[in-house]
Amino acid sequence: MLRRFATYLLAVTLLATSLAPFSTFAAPTAPSQNSHQRRERKLAPELETATTGTVRVIIQSKGRSTAAQDQAVSARGGNKRKALENLDAMVADVPASALADLAARDDIDYISPDRRVNAQMDVTGEAVGAKLAKQGYAGAPGVTGKGVGIAIIDSGISANHPDFKKNNNKSRIVAAVNFTTGLAADRSGHGTGVAGVAAGNGTASTGYAGNYAGIAPEANLIDLKVLDDNGAGTTSAVLDAINWAITNRNRFDIRVINMSLGTPVRESFRTDPLSKAVARATQAGIVVVCSAGNNGRTEQITGYDANGEPIYRLVYGAINSPGNSPYALTVGATDSHSTVKRSDDTMASFSSKGPTQFDHLAKPDVVAPGRRLVAPMSLDNPNSAIGHEDRIVAPVSPTARPNSYFKYSGTSFSAPVVSGIVALMLDANKSLTPLLAKV
């Protein structure tokens, strides 16, 4: 991902060798005749057998959604819930018995169900070269991601955490929108951890054993909440958040979207609404970073390594959507074994592996540290760590604020490592395009 860029950006030279590339990006080719025939089946597989009740669906248009399409939904007993203008789509509740008739319209491209989506730094910054990038290298100025907007589409961000505030106590979260029906607070803690890995500034780590700053500590954060207290959400909420990010790209200088969430792949990226939304965001000039997923192994233990760690039976072809999009910068996880050196890094067995279902694309694109990353804990729910008290990082000074940091694992936390690195790159070169950042 970063090799070409490193040839002319010395300030982030180490980043070029810190992320291991898994595949080279290629723009999607034109669909074959067989894939074209599949597209003529304009209902997602789960909807083809639906006959009773009302179903919440994502209706993709051929071109802009029109009043005629709204009327067609209404005439069939449906109810339009939300227009997604930037995505040429709408969210609607439609009787199952009317779906086939609606899909037969020439101006309808594809109809999918509103699927469920789910959620998926002590030495991390130094291990991927971010520390050197911040300091500067060979006479080049340091970069911190200053002013670059990173949209965190997740469970929210704990705005009161010191790591998300500037020296003047002003929040670095420049916008916050709640796309769920619940509270805006991050009661699951997932989004706070993700945001901290990408762009926490480590303010609260005074009195701890290390400086737990994220990769781009001066980037701006945009909090787009789509997941509930249990880390679950809907496709429509994610699409709504992506649509909002595209609309407000210039207002908040949104150059990066991080999505540490996903849903199992059930169709080609050519019809999957999340994958198509990733393409739209990329075309709007936003780098979209996605977690690969945590379905890389079964729970069957086949042996133990030299350190006594269990070896699990691996699973292939388990990349989640929207990480299956060729436009997404999809990130798998490594285990850095809590060291700075990379010679002892190994692939995390839980990290989902390619190829992608249906399209057989090589994924993930890169891997980054994703095990035992220290990042901020949410202050919105003191009970979020119950059952995982051993992963709370204890301070070494009695004057330090306790319960400020947590050890996270998963590709959910590998992805924001890369999002932070992209922000550093954009800090150094504002004209960097999403496709150039990816290759």
Question: What are the functions of these language-model segments?
Answer:
Residues 2-141, 148-150, 162:
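Autoinhibitory N-terminal propeptides
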Residues 30, 71, 79, 137-177, ...:
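Subtilisin-like serine protease catalytic core
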Residues 343-351:
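Short Pro/Gly-enriched beta-strand edge/turn motifs at strand-loop
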Residues 73, 85-86, 91-95, 101, ...:
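Mobile, glycine-rich extracellular loop/lid and propeptide segments
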Residues 54-62, 87-89, 138-139, 180-185, ...:
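Second-shell loop/turn segments in exported
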Residues 154, 191, 293, 412, ...:
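Conserved G/P- and acidic residue-centered "switch" motifs that form tight phosphate/ATP-binding loops
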Residues 67-71, 97, 144, 181, ...:
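Substrate-binding/access-modulating region of protease and related hydrolase catalytic domains
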Residues 193-197, 240, 416-424:
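Short amphipathic alpha-helical face segments that pack within enzyme cores
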